[in-house]
Amino acid sequence: MGIRDAAYPGSFDPITFGHVNIVKRSIERFDNLYVVVVNNPNKKYLFSLQERIEMVKKDLEDIPNVIVESFDGLLVNYLKEKKIYNLIRGLRAVSDYEYELQMANANHMLFPQLEIFFLMADTDFSYISSSMIKEIASYNGDVSKWVSKFVELKLKEKLLKK
């Protein structure tokens, strides 16, 4: 843990190739990247926290210096506890920016030493979201362009078992 480490938080419900792209681009700039699977009690998830952690670990297992952890609570408390001063956020569109700017301002007020880095989504992934992928998968649509085989299988198990 230290000044050259960063955190990339998200619900990852499920993890997509867009998330993986942000991780790969982030790890080039930092010594270690903590991918933090967050658990917000006010949010409804398709996958349990343990399932989301399993998918994230599987999809990121070949990327060195990536540490997958989970946290529920205020993100800045996790960052302070770990002594992580850099936060990565991915942006797909202008609509993401408004929300992320509000969150960045709040986080900076709570943790003034925090540097927040916004990475624009690669154009190949700028239009995808976990919600969109879940909807397509729920109709047995092909999501292989956006998620790994492992995640695709987990989606089918979860959504098509009914």
UniProtKB/Swiss-Prot annotation:
Pfam families on file: CTP_transf_like
Q: In which pathway does it act?
A: Cofactor biosynthesis; coenzyme A biosynthesis; CoA from (R)-pantothenate: step 4/5
Q: Which cofactor does it need?
A: Mg(2+)
The positions annotated as site (Transition state stabilizer) read 19
- Cite the SUPFAM superfamilies for this sequence: Nucleotidylyl transferase
- How would you classify this enzyme at the top EC level? transferase
For this UniProt entry, the molecular function terms from Gene Ontology, in alphabetical order, are: ATP binding; pantetheine-phosphate adenylyltransferase activity
In its keyword annotation, does this UniProt entry include Cytoplasm? yes
Q: Does the keyword Transferase apply?
A: yes
Q: Where in the cell is it found?
A: Cytoplasm
Where substrate binds, per the record, is at: 11, 43, 75, 89
- Report the GO terms under cellular component: cytoplasm
- Signal sequence residues: none
Instruction: List the GO biological process terms.
Output: coenzyme A biosynthetic process
Please tell me where ATP binds in this chain. Answer: 11-12, 19, 90-92, 100, 125-131
Annotated InterPro entries: Cyt_trans-like (IPR004821), PPAT (IPR001980), Rossmann-like_a/b/a_fold (IPR014729)
> What is this enzyme's EC?
2.7.7.3
Tell me how this protein assembles: Homohexamer.
The UniProt entry, under PANTHER family, shows: PHOSPHOPANTETHEINE ADENYLYLTRANSFERASE
Q: Which family does it belong to?
A: Belongs to the bacterial CoaD family.
What does this protein do, in the record's words?
Reversibly transfers an adenylyl group from ATP to 4'-phosphopantetheine, yielding dephospho-CoA (dPCoA) and pyrophosphate.
NCBIfam families to which the protein is assigned, alphabetical: coaD_prev_kdtB (TIGR01510), cyt_tran_rel (TIGR00125)
- Protein's recorded name: Phosphopantetheine adenylyltransferase
Query: What is the phylogenetic placement of the source species in the record?
Result: Bacteria, Thermotogati, Thermotogota, Thermotogae, Petrotogales
